[in-house]
């Protein structure tokens, strides 16, 4: 990208864990009723990925709670925009794009998609985005870091899915 004349700088996601938790609350605010009713009407079974994210056992939120969640969403969007403005002041240019992974792994094994955080935060922000393939996994280059210690239970599940070769890696822009 730099060879093409673009300025590239590191971007640290702002309050990422907070955003992931917030979007999950929004996704599951009806306790999974909408998605499971739609699946029932279609005759399609719920895939494990959906049941993890939209579990019918999740508590439904009432209208006032939902409004409060959306106020938190709006506040987070405003804070994120402020982070953009601060970075633009720092670099002296407008930010044209954030280029980030869409998934933590190169490909997803059937029924093993566990972490929605990368794409979901972009959705929470209401950003326009596109996913593009950028390279391929290569077992000679993309080696497992044996001494890696997972940051959480979810991170351990994701790390267990990271051994691929020949599959595409994608970025969300």
Please name every model-derived segment.
Residues 129-132:
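Short hydrophobic alpha-helical runs that function as membrane-insertion/retention elements
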Residues 1-120, 124, 134-169:
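Amidase signature
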Residues 171-173:
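Short, hydrophobic/proline-enriched secondary-structure or compact coil segments at domain edges
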